[in-house]
Each structure stands twice: as structure tokens, then as C-alpha cells.
């Protein structure tokens, strides 16, 4: 069975460190991931970006740009998730951060907080496929535009 999942994510890099969240549920549990997530009904891409980024990091986005789209296939034991990811570079004010809520309006927050992680320390052992795709992009890998298939994905 293949499940399509579309998510919108914010990328913030400062001093070669990536603003990450740590997932507490789902296929990327206990891995570093990008802040972001799924659209709500009638929500535009940038509205989702702003809402999800604030919910998961506490930071408000001052500006965004460089929209791009990638995809990966994550094969778990009984299903395959086709994860379509929309990336935006974001600018935030580090001086203003709201408290991150455990419980959101209609769901639980699936993030255990934020972490600034050196890009060189992010790899397949500790990161989601989204971060791995971002690293591929940042290294100017020409294959970044092609799909990646993760067979027998391990949930930590």
C-alpha cells in the first residue's frame, strides 16, 4: 500500500547549524527533522509553513523564499509512504520565541523541541529523509532532484 504525504517545511541555517525538531511519533520518531507539516483545509502553502513552523519551534517567520519540491519513498514493514516535501528558506527573529505547546488545536505536537545541529553531524543514523534530502541539495548533488527510495526504513 502506498500513502501520499505532502508536507511544507522551513529551513533555517545559522553558522552551519540547522534548526531541527526531534520527532516523538511516526516513521521519523527519535530522529531530527525539519519543522513543518501538513496543510489544513483551505490553507495555502505559505500559511501552512508559518503555522507549522511556529507550532513546532515557537519562532515566528519574518520572511521566506526559495521554494522547491522534492520527494522520497519510505518503505516500512507494511506500507510505503511517498513523502512530497516543499521546502522554503525562512528568516526568523531568534530574540522572540513563544512557548511550544504539547497539545495543539486538534492534534498533539509531534515535536519534542528544537535543536541547532551542526550540518556535518546529521546523517541517516539520526535524521529524517527530509534532512538527508536537504543535505543532498546543499552539497550540490545533481541527483537531489531525483527520488530516493529508503527500503526497510528503521523506526528508532
Language-model-detected regions and their locations in the chain:
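Conserved Nudix-box catalytic region and its N-terminal flanking loop in Nudix hydrolases
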Residues: 17-55, 151-156
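Conserved N-terminal beta-strand and adjoining loop/helix that marks the start
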Residues: 1-18, 64, 85-89
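Unchanged
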Residues: 39-62, 72-127
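Residues that recognize and position ribonucleotide moieties
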Residues: 4, 11, 32, 59, ...
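Residue-level recognition of beta-strand microenvironments
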Residues: 66-69
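Nudix hydrolase/Nudix homology domain
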Residues: 27, 105-156
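Short, hydrophobic secondary-structure boundary micro-motifs
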Residues: 21, 98-102, 147-148
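Exposed loop/turn and edge beta-strand positions of beta-sandwich/beta-sheet ligand-binding modules
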Residues: 4-6, 28-30, 82
